[in-house]
Structures are given as structure tokens and as C-alpha cells.
């Protein structure tokens, strides 16, 4: 799990305290702030959604999304993560210059127990789903220069903003659109490849830390 990010609850100590009090108030009184609402379709998962999957599995939910004009594969969906991550090599391969990054003082904790300062933040449009059942939203990514088998990570608040439901059993995300329920299927083969690659990266880093006697 990665702690830190661009969400409201982590922007400042005052904002975090304010958010905590709001959550406490809802829990104690059952009242929520009045916001414009419209009826959303019911989202559910079916046994037919697990077709072409090997079971029982313990694979992560790894998807492909469209970021601006690029199809970005090997994107990890992490409900326990509080920061959208774009790894620097991917950022470079998309043709972006480092000057595009917005400076940030955000500190990330969770990469092997280490504290990592992002190179900066960048807001990019992300499209998921298939035409017509798709959505396009702006996502603010923290760009991190760190070894990873993944090209990026989608985090909890972004998934919530899509009103998305995720199922690691079905390796799928579903979300409401103007034209019904959109779907984003995970890639089980890519998930296995990323898992193996991450183990190799970890083994390499541990080897580098061994000192000669």
C-alpha cells in the first residue's frame, strides 16, 4: 500500500482533520451533505464475467487504459492505494518533458518501506471502457522515478470518482456511463508477468544491499 497523494484528505493537516470530523459526523448522525444526485444503475458481477480466467487465482487487477493518445498497459488497480502513480520511464515514453511536471512536496511511503519524493505531478485525461460505454476523466498522477514492473497505478479516490466497483475475483472494473454499465477487464497474463518481474526486481535490490565482508 502507498500512503500519500493528491487527495483532499492528504493535502494538509487542517484538511485531514476537517475531513475526519465530517466522517465522524456522518457516522454519528447518519446525515450527509446535500448534493445533486441522480439515480445510478445497479452494478453487479456475474459468473459469466469470469470466463477465460484461470481459477482459483491470487492475481492482481492489472488493466490497460488510454492516457491522452497512448494505450498504457500494465496499470495496477489498487483499492488500498491513495495516490495515482505514473512511473517516470512511462512518462518519458509518452513523449513528455520533465518541464511539464508541476512541483509537489508530497511524500509517498510504501515502496519497500522507503519514503519517496515524486519528481512532480501531471494531470492527464484517462479513458476507460469501450465505445459507447466509456468515460473520460482528468487524473492527476504523481510521477515517480522508481523501478517497477508496472507502468502506473490507479488509486482509490479516482475509482470512487468514477463510481466504480472492482472485483479481484472477476478481475474486472464496472462503472456507470450515460449509455449503461461500462467494463474494464483485467489482463491475467500481464498480472502474472508483472508479479514475476516485481520479484526479480526485489531480488536484485536485495542483492545490491549485501555488503562484502
Regions found by a protein language model. Give the residues of each.
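Short linear "hotspot" motifs
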Residues: 1-213
Amino acid at each position: 500500500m502507498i500512503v500519500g497523494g493528491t487527495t483532499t484528505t492528504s493535502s494538509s493537516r487542517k484538511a485531514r482533520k476537517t475531513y475526519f470530523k465530517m466522517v465522524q459526523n456522518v457516522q454519528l448522525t447518519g446525515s450527509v451533505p446535500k448534493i445533486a444526485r441522480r439515480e445510478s444503475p445497479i452494478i453487479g458481477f456475474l459468473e459469466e464475467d469470469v470466463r477465460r480466467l484461470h481459477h482459483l487465482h491470487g492475481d492482481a487487477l492489472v488493466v490497460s487504459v488510454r492516457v491522452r493518445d497512448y494505450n498504457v498497459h500494465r496499470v495496477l488497480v489498487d483499492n488500498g492505494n491513495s495516490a495515482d502513480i505514473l512511473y517516470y520511464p512511462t512518462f518519458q515514453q509518452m513523449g513528455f518533458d520533465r518541464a511539464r511536471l508541476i512541483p509537489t512536496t508530497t511524500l509517498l511511503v510504501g515502496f519497500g518501506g522507503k519514503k519517496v519524493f515524486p519528481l512532480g505531478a501531471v494531470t492527464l485525461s484517462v479513458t476507460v471502457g469501450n465505445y459507447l460505454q466509456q468515460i473520460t476523466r482528468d487524473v492527476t498522477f504523481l510521477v515517480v522515478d522508481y523501478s517497477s514492473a508496472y507502468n502506473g497505478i490507479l488509486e482509490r479516490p479516482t475509482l470512487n470518482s468514477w463510481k466504480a466497483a472492482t472485483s479481484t475475483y472477476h478481475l474486472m472494473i464496472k462503472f456507470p456511463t450515460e449509455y449503461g454499465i461500462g467494463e474494464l477487464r483485467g489482463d491475467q497474463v500481464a498480472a502474472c508477468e508483472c508479479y514475476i518481474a516485481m520479484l526479480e526486481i526485489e531480488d536484485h535490490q536485495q542483492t545490491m544491499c549485501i555488503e562484502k565482508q
